């Protein structure tokens, strides 16, 4: 129906200036590269960041920082870790806890030493002394710390940046020496010859945590026959019973070979015995050419296939009967025994007979000690065979030694087969090169001495996810003693003195205490700078000529593993045990374990109450990030943008933080350009919803204009109750470290509950009503309460946006910062869950109507939903009850069903309409949509039958006329 108002189009008044349009300085775009640093400066200026948590009066909460390594640029793993920690700390701070987060750095170790050496030419290296190297390494580490610290700050991470802990600090080194001393006094530290993981490329021993196992390593595996020289009498008797034809006329067994399998041919020269399991069943088997071998019965078929020879079983014997066989070495003129090993000898692989070189394997070493075998190390620090290997001296065990030895085994008739074998093999995590087992004199922590206490302590800790407990339990249960010495310069020295002309070691309470005191004042450099006489306590000065300093340094895992001793058990406002340790899942064998072992050894309990782990950051295709794949995502590029801003836009720190909150970090997490776009979209939705709330509060002062909660319309009361539910849900999410639930809940709240429902309905109240109308003020009351809560709820994650919102709330607030307000609480008056069932039914009906209206728009039958009239026949009791519930209220023309459905008119029941655009019947209602009757109000866009009679305003409805004339 056409509008027949008499005013010409030219003379009609415009009503834009009479509407309450949005006004706010809170931009649609974050402009994060400029705005976020401004907000960080505001926090520093007002002492709101670290100082806020420190000045809280609640109970202390301590998240102890696992120190990142002070080398290299920050990557997505750093971002995932540090942002997770910051989310937790900010949440605990807002809850009123006393939070003192002390960030730390691991500053010693080979990678830094190598960086220093790589930056020098040959002449500089030739002039390099240990102390010069240490000075350069310290300077390098401190520079790296400064750069990484700047990055963490830019991410919005709060912490005691003025007083971080560094493992190179004097006090830290002194505390570490004292901890080492306490373990010495308890009998948990010893020196001994043992096979350890040795890195020829680094020329130092390595701990298990310093190893990695890349895929694709292939070894030369060999089956070797060791010719039997002599057999014990009881074995001869057993053979005579089962296969007398194998005994010759002299009563001796015909030629037979013991078959072993190994993946390290270079260890054959070091063979001292062959070990068998006395519980296993072995067999003497005969080939078609009548040659005999001894092998585990269960492995005969598999070995036959591998070597390509068919064998017939002739004699079955227990492993215990093999004890005492004497065999000849296949390469040297030497005889050795068959001995009984342990349960490490199985039939899972190999032959059931284990080539035993006590200097090159832990099980071999233990068996060697048991039988008093020679424990010789045939390899030097660089990986070359020594004179103990005879004619093979000078060959490199990782290069040419294997080929030469295999060739000689072929020539001696001892090699049955060589087969390439792909398997997990330990590599040096720093140099990315293979390691070996090598027996050397090292310092060890005797884990066996406190293993049971450590396992008990694990049970007292909450592990998240729970699988972490089983993981670390099995690691501690199965691990050997901890090799804590390293043959490097850049580290904390093991404070021991060795007798120059004897075997004695000087290491006692007096010497350790004295060294610790010296380190606390001068630092560990003095171990290299001072003479022995300057390092010994006064009572030993007359013996200075007798002693010399040790040259070993401590494993860097001992450094970081002692951080609880120098940080959380020493500094004020920190808890020991810490409330939480949070690191990557690889730290079960790293920092979690080293911290656990040192704390249990000294204090018999874990240094943490709860341990939370996260996975690794991968690319969008689930691949590990690497330069070779070209798939590295740089957190700095996420924040500031790349060289091509279209490809790599500047998202800011909050989008990075929102990504962290969005993922299931208990597993490995993907990140890439597509994911960032999705996260940015969610960020924008939260921001724009917040902007809409702020923009409608420009003329609102809560103290003056707010409406009492009890007098609010039903829709508003429902909105507050829904906000209360969201606060509960998000609080639980933060408390349980389930940040992805926060992400989902806040997104759903802003988009579904606010933008698509409450605010969609509220637009008419906000824009069209007079400024001080109850319809508008009641809605503004809700908007002000909700925006304050949203600001608080997002603050731990979207800290910059939350603060920006707070600074743009147009009325006076008692707190200068959202973080000073504290965690959002829920007033009792907000809660009324009885609304939910009715609103749910009405929203269900609203969704049907919206879908039908959308269909009309798509068919170009309608433009705005206000061009429609709706008739509904209700057939469902719940929907009918909801409509009646709303009709009973209609508070000041707010709770009107047509406004909830955003149509110009609504009819419940009555006769079906003759002319409809679309209709639908479902289980709970019959819905018809038709063109609205009447005239379109040019101010509110509703269609009304009766329009203004005022000659100046004939194009607006009577409701709008009252508002306009009152202006």
UniProtKB/Swiss-Prot annotation:
UniProt record, GO biological process: isoleucyl-tRNA aminoacylation
Catalyzed reactions: tRNA(Ile) + L-isoleucine + ATP = L-isoleucyl-tRNA(Ile) + AMP + diphosphate
Motif 'KMSKS' region: positions: 624-628
UniProt comment concerning the protein's domains: IleRS has two distinct active sites: one for aminoacylation and one for editing. The misactivated valine is translocated from the active site to the editing site, which sterically excludes the correctly activated isoleucine. The single editing site contains two valyl binding pockets, one specific for each substrate (Val-AMP or Val-tRNA(Ile)).
Binding-site residues for L-isoleucyl-5'-AMP, renumbered to this chain: 583
Subunit details: Monomer.
Cellular localization per UniProt: Cytoplasm
Cofactor binding notes: Binds 1 zinc ion per subunit.
EC number(s) recorded for this UniProt protein: 6.1.1.5
Cofactor: Zn(2+)
Major location (coarse): cytoplasm
Membership in a protein family: Belongs to the class-I aminoacyl-tRNA synthetase family. IleS type 1 subfamily.
UniProt short sequence motif 'HIGH' region, positions renumbered to this chain: 68-78
One Gene Ontology molecular-function label: isoleucine-tRNA ligase activity
Protein name: Isoleucine--tRNA ligase
Enzyme class, first EC level, given as a word: ligase
GO CC field: cytoplasm
Binding of Zn(2+), residues: 937, 940, 957, 960
Entry binding sites for ATP: 627
NCBIfam families in the record: ileS
Gene3D superfamilies to which the protein is assigned, alphabetical: 1.10.730.20, HUPs, Valyl/Leucyl/Isoleucyl-tRNA synthetase, editing domain
Pfam families: Anticodon_1 (PF08264), tRNA-synt_1 (PF00133), zf-FPG_IleRS (PF06827)
PROSITE patterns the UniProt entry points to: AA_TRNA_LIGASE_I
């Amino acid at each position: 129906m056409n509008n027949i108002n008499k005013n010409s189009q030219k003379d009609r008044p415009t009503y834009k200036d009479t509407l309450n349009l949005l006004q706010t300085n809170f931009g649609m775009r974050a402009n994060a590269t400029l705005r976020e640093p401004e907000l960080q400066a505001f926090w520093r200026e007002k002492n709101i960041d670290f100082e806020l948590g420190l000045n809280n009066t609640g109970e202390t909460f301590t998240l102890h920082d696992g120190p990142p390594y002070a080398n290299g640029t920050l990557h997505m793993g750093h971002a995932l870790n540090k942002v997770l920690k910051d989310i937790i700390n900010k949440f605990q701070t807002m809850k009123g806890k006393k939070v003192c987060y002390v960030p730390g750095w691991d500053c010693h170790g080979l990678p830094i030493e190598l960086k220093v050496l790589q930056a020098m030419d040959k002449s500089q290296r030739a002039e390099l002394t240990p102390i010069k190297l240490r000075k350069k390494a310290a300077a390098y580490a401190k520079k790296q710390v400064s750069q990484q610290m700047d990055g963490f700050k830019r991410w919005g991470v709060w912490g005691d940046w003025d007083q971080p802990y560094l493992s190179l600090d004097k006090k830290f080194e002194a505390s570490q020496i004292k901890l080492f001393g306490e373990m010495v006094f308890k009998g948990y530290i010893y020196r001994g010859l043992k096979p350890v993981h040795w890195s020829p490329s680094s020329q130092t021993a390595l701990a298990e945590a310093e190893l990695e196992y890349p895929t694709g390593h292939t070894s030369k595996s060999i089956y070797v026959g060791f010719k039997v020289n002599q057999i014990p009498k009881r074995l001869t008797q057993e053979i005579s019973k089962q296969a007398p034809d194998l005994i010759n006329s002299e009563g001796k067994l015909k030629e037979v070979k013991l078959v072993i399998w190994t993946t390290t041919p270079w260890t054959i020269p070091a063979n001292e015995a062959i070990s068998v399991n006395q519980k296993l069943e072995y067999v003497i088997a005969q080939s078609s050419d009548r040659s005999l071998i001894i092998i585990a019965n269960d492995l005969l078929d598999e070995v036959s296939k591998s070597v390509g020879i068919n064998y017939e079983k002739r004699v079955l014997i227990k492993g215990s009967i093999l004890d005492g066989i004497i065999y000849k070495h296949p390469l040297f003129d030497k005889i050795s025994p068959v001995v009984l090993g342990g349960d490490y000898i199985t039939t899972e692989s190999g032959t059931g007979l284990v080539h035993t070189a006590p200097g090159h394997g832990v099980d071999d070493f233990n068996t060697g000690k048991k039988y008093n075998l020679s424990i010789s190390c045939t390899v030097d620090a660089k990986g070359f065979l020594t004179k103990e290997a005879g004619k093979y001296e000078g060959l490199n065990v990782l290069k040419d030694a294997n080929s030469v030895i295999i060739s000689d085994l072929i020539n001696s008739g001892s090699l049955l087969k060589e087969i390439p074998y792909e398997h997990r093999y330990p590599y040096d995590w720093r140099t990315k090169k293979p390691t070996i087992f090598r027996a050397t004199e090292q310092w060890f922590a005797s884990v066996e001495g406190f293993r049971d206490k450590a396992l008990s302590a694990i049970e007292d800790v909450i592990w998240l996810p729970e699988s972490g407990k089983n993981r670390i339990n099995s690691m501690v249960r199965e691990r050997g003693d901890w090799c804590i010495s390293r043959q490097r310069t850049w580290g904390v020295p093991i404070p021991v003195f060795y007798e120059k002309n004897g075997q004695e070691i000087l290491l006692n309470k007096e010497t350790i205490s004295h060294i610790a005191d010296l380190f606390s004042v001068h630092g560990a450099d003095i171990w290299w700078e001072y003479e022995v006489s300057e390092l010994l306590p006064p009572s030993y000065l007359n013996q200075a000529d007798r002693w010399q300093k040790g040259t070993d340094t401590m494993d860097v895992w001992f450094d970081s593993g002692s951080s609880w001793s120098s940080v959380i058990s020493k500094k004020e406002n920190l808890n020991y045990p810490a409330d939480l340790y949070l690191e990557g899942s690889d730290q079960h064998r790293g920092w979690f374990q080293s911290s656990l072992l040192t704390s249990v050894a000294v204090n018999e309990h874990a240094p943490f109450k709860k341990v939370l782990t996260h996975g690794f950051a991968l690319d969008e295709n689930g691949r590990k990030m690497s330069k070779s794949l070209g798939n590295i995502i740089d957190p700095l590029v996420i924040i500031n943008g790349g060289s091509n801003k279209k490809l790599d836009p500047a998202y800011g720190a909050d989008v990075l933080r929102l990504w962290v909150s969005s993922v299931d970090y208990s597993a490995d997490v993907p990140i890439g350009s597509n994911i960032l776009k999705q996260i940015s979209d969610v960020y924008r939705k939260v921001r724009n919803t917040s902007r809409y709330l702020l923009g409608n509060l420009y003329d609102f002062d809560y103290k003056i204009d707010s409406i009492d909660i009890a007098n609010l319309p039903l829709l508003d009361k429902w909105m507050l109750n829904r906000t209360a539910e969201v606060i509960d849900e998000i609080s639980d999410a933060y408390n349980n470290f389930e940040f992805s639930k926060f992400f989902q809940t806040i997104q759903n709240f802003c988009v579904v509950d606010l933008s698509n429902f409450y605010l969609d309905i509220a637009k008419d109240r906000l824009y069209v009503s007079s400024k001080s109308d109850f319809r508008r003020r009641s809605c503004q009351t809700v908007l002000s309460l909700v925006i304050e809560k949203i600001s608080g709820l997002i603050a731990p994650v979207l800290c910059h946006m939350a603060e920006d919102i707070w600074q743009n709330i147009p009325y006076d607030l008692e707190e200068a910062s959202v973080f000073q307000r504290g965690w959002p609480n829920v007033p009792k008056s907000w809660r009324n869950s009885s609304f939910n069932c009715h609103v749910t039914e009405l929203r269900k009906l609203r969704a049907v109507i919206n879908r039908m209206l959308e269909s009309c728009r798509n068919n170009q039958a309608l433009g705005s939903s206000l061009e429609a009239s709706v008739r509904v026949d209700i057939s469902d009791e719940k929907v009918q009850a909801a409509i009646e519930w709303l009709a009973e209220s209609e508070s000041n023309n707010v709770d009107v069903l047509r406004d909830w459905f955003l149509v110009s008119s609504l009819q419940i029941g009555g006769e079906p309409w003759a002319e409809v655009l679309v209709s639908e019947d479902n289980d709970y209602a019959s819905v018809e949509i038709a063109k609205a009757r009447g005239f379109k109000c040019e101010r509110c866009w509703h269609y009304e039958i009766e329009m203004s009679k005022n000659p100046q305003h004939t194009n607006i409805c009577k409701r709008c006329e009252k508002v306009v004339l009152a202006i």
